[in-house]
């Protein structure tokens, strides 16, 4: 059964690009979430407050860093991963594996191939991610950049007038 937590879910935001900036603002807006860290790859963003990076008009008291080890050492409950993965697919997989093994849940915008990887990606790759999650007691959810629309609702809408769908 679902229970309400007494303490907020401690979250690290991984990147402050377009989606990452929106994620920082969304995390801040939810009282059940606590932003505890922000990863950036751009040296110019290191040390800048997450609120400013997100385009908010206030500081959130969380300075961005490029120190991966320091962020993992915080022991966050979850990482919201919005770093670009379509052109650095294996980099994303390696990041997810590391986070899962460390016991950190991951919610990611990509790579979209992980939304349903069976029959697309090698089973060994899928099995390795699953094993990392089991070993760390953590989960991975890839929702894409547009959850609730393109990959789940749009196909239903587009096929709603169909009499038959051949798979």
Regions found by a protein language model. Give the residues of each.
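N-terminal glycine-/serine-/threonine-rich beta1-alpha1-beta2 phosphate-ribose binding loop
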Residues: 2-101
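Structural motif
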Residues: 14, 109, 141-145
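Gly/Ser/Thr-rich loops at beta-strand to alpha-helix junctions
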Residues: 17-19, 113-116, 121-122, 145-151
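Hydrophobic beta-strand scaffold residues
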Residues: 35, 106, 139-140
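Short, ordered loop/turn segments at secondary-structure junctions
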Residues: 41-43, 84, 104, 110-114, ...
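Rossmann-fold NAD(P)-binding glycine/threonine-rich loop
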Residues: 93-94, 102, 109-138
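Conserved anion/nucleotide-ligand pocket segment
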Residues: 141-167
């Amino acid at each position: 059964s679902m229970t309400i937590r007494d303490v907020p879910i401690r979250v690290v935001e991984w990147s402050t690009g377009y989606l990452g900036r929106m994620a920082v603002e969304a995390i801040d807006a939810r009282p059940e979430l606590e932003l505890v860290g922000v990863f950036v790859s751009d040296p110019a963003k290191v040390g800048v407050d997450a609120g400013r990076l997100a385009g908010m008009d206030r500081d959130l008291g969380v300075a961005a860093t490029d120190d991966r080890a320091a962020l993992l050492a915080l022991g966050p409950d979850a990482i919201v991963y919005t770093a670009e993965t379509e052109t650095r697919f294996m980099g994303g997989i390696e990041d997810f594996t590391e986070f899962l093994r460390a016991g950190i849940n991951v919610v990611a915008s990509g790579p979209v191939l992980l939304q349903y990887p069976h029959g697309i990606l090698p089973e060994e790759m899928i099995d390795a991610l699953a094993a990392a999650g089991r070993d760390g007691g953590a989960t991975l959810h890839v929702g894409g950049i547009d959850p609730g629309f393109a990959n789940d609702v749009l196909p239903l809408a587009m096929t709603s007038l169909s009499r038959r769908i051949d798979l």
